[in-house]
Curated annotation (Swiss-Prot):
NCBIfam families: arch_bud32, arch_KAE1, gcp_kae1, PRK09605.1, PRK14879.1-4. Its cofactor is Fe(2+). The lineage of its organism: Archaea, Methanobacteriati, Methanobacteriota, Methanomada group, Methanobacteria. ATP binds at residues 340-348, 361. This is Probable bifunctional tRNA threonylcarbamoyladenosine biosynthesis protein. The active site is at 451 (proton acceptor). It is found in: Cytoplasm. SUPFAM superfamilies: Actin-like ATPase domain, Protein kinase-like (PK-like). Its EC number is 2.3.1.234, 2.7.11.1.
Length: 534
């Protein structure tokens, strides 16, 4: 059976034809290039209405098939621009009715992952999905693709486009910035904002525009924007990789064509001894083939949609969709024998300190980061982590005993905390409440952990011990407290979806015994700023 897929979530119209075996028979597309400014939803819809019929005819001709040989119609149901989505859905319904064939609406983001898996052979990767409208770190768990991290404000592609527009470089901004960066002479420091596995680009964009207004060269700014933003992207992917212990990384989405980002991610994968995958460039941007292939999968495992169920969903979350064709791989990361564990930031070794067993945490230099970013992060995070660990003890929170710290070398020597990671004990509701109280004590003391995941909370005997304060900081702002707790919530949802709701409710219950602020409202407010969250 042949499936014809129609893509049009934003400014690119795409049509593809794919058979049941995953052979791409044709791929046609037409982007909208605005004369000035960004993409207007109405103009995108008009563009799709004009080009969908033409591209369908061209795709059939390329595939050597008649339109009547198409057995299934698939279309992007969301997420995306409302007018654009509705135009695509109307075209898909009309075509399905006229051909008297079934129709399925599919998730655009999952389409990128599935065409990536199809074309690269990746089986169960951590996916970094980067485009104009989306920035997510995604991995499969418990029947769905879970979002382990994402932008808290604007997508990386949107950030690049906005800078290009404001600086007169035109649209799309990514390719122009990539070329300008090759001519740079120096790095200009810009905000580096990683919060657990989430990231923020708005501060980076604002700072870059101010530097431009102050006279900084566009070449240096282009280079600095890329190095800062892409280092953040690779770091959060690295964090998800360490957390999930998967052995593959897939780069997908329109920004994936950037050579510098590809090289940085490949370097990180080599450091972690895992596979790196990226689809061919023609499948990175929005395209009809990814929609057609996902349509084949959805139809095979779920069947067709009723016509009344083909409405569009502008804020269609990746983690709303069951993916019954996926299976979690049992393969994991194989580390060299001398490394006890490898986190996103550091290698962990066992050692001896004046005759006592200890853990050596070494923040190794990251080959994917330029020295100006790498050295600053390694030394500043080491200094800050040591202070946070010690001050947390003063707040009545258990943390490892520090034996020695070398900030310039990025090395910390501390006791080994042996116990059960919280991720393996989330069903214990009383424990969840006690963890909430401990987080409350940290926040009451002005300590933000920065990476509250189930791996960084250890249950040792009857004690709750917090480790890895590498992303921590000192703050008494309720915004930072909310983000800290949101990191924990998303970590729970990513790996224990069925238990996450009850567990996090108990965490907040315990937290409320220490902190009187309306933290739940703050968390909901922060969540509402994210991409495609209700």
């Amino acid at each position: 059976m042949l499936c014809l897929g129609i893509e049009g979530t934003a400014e690119k119209t795409g049509v593809g034809i794919v058979d049941e075996a995953g052979n791409v028979l044709s791929l046609r597309g037409k982007p909208l290039i605005p004369e000035k400014g960004g993409i207007h939803p109405r103009e995108a819809a008009e563009h799709h209405a004009k080009w969908i019929p033409r591209l369908i005819a061209e795709a059939c001709r390329d595939a050597g098939v008649e339109l009547g040989e198409i057995g299934l119609i698939s279309f992007s149901r969301g997420p995306g621009l409302g007018p654009a989505l509705r135009t695509v859905a109307t075209a898909a319904r009309t075509l399905a009715l006229s051909l008297d064939v079934p129709i399925v609406g599919v998730n655009h983001c999952i389409g990128h992952i599935e065409i990536g898996r199809l074309t690269t052979g990746a089986s169960d990767p951590v996916s970094l999905y980067v485009s104009g409208g989306n920035t997510q770190v995604i991995a499969f768990n418990e029947g769905r693709y879970r979002v382990f991290g994402e932008t808290l404000d604007i997508a990386v592609g949107n950030m690049l486009d906005q800078f290009a527009r404001e600086s007169g470089l035109g649209h799309p901004g990514g390719p122009v910035i990539e070329q300008l960066a090759l001519k740079a002479s120096e790095y200009i420091e810009l905000p580096y904002s990683v919060k657990g596995m989430d990231i923020s680009f708005s501060g980076l964009l604002t700072a870059a525009l101010r530097k431009m207004e102050a006279g900084a060269s566009l070449e240096d700014l282009a280079y600095s924007i890329q190095e800062t933003a892409f280092s953040m992207l690779v770091e959060v992917t690295e964090r998800a990789l360490a957390y999930t212990e998967k052995n593959q990384v897939l780069l997908c989405g329109g920004v994936a064509v950037n050579r510098r980002l590809r090289d940085m991610l490949r370097e990180m994968c080599q450091e972690h001894h895992v596979e790196f995958h990226m689809p061919p460039p023609e499948y990175c941007g929005d395209n009809g083939a990814m929609i057609a292939w996902l349509g084949q999968l959805v139809y095979k495992y779920r069947g067709p949609d009723a016509l009344e169920d083909t409405t569009v969903v502008q804020r269609y979350r990746t983690d709303e969709v069951d993916v019954p064709w996926m299976r979690e791989s049992e393969a994991g990361i194989e580390l060299p024998p001398d490394i006890l564990a490898k986190g996103a930031e550091a290698n962990i070794y066992r050692g001896q300190w004046i005759g006592r067993p200890c853990i050596i945490k070494e923040r190794i230099s990251k080959g994917y980061r330029i020295p100006e970013i790498d050295q600053k992060l390694r030394s500043s995070r080491t200094r800050r982590e040591a202070r946070l660990i010690n001050q947390a003890k003063g707040a009545g929170v258990h943390t490892p005993v520090l034996f020695d710290v070398d900030p310039d070398g990025g090395v910390m020597v501390m006791e080994e905390v042996r116990g059960t990671p919280f991720r393996d004990a989330v069903e214990d509701t009383e424990l969840c409440s006690r963890i909430g109280e401990a987080i409350g004590r940290l926040h009451h003391a002005g300590i933000i952990h920065g990476d509250l995941t189930g791996s960084n909370i250890i249950i040792r005997g009857g004690d709750v011990v917090f480790i890895d304060f590498g992303l921590g900081r000192f703050s008494d702002e309720i915004e930072d407290m909310g983000v800290d707790l949101l990191v924990l919530k998303k970590s729970l949802e990513s790996t224990h979806y069925a238990l996450a709701g009850e567990c996090f409710s108990r965490v907040l219950e315990g937290y409320g015994k220490i902190i009187d602020a309306d933290i739940q409202s703050k968390i909901r407010e922060i969540e509402s700023r994210g991409r495609y969250t209700d």
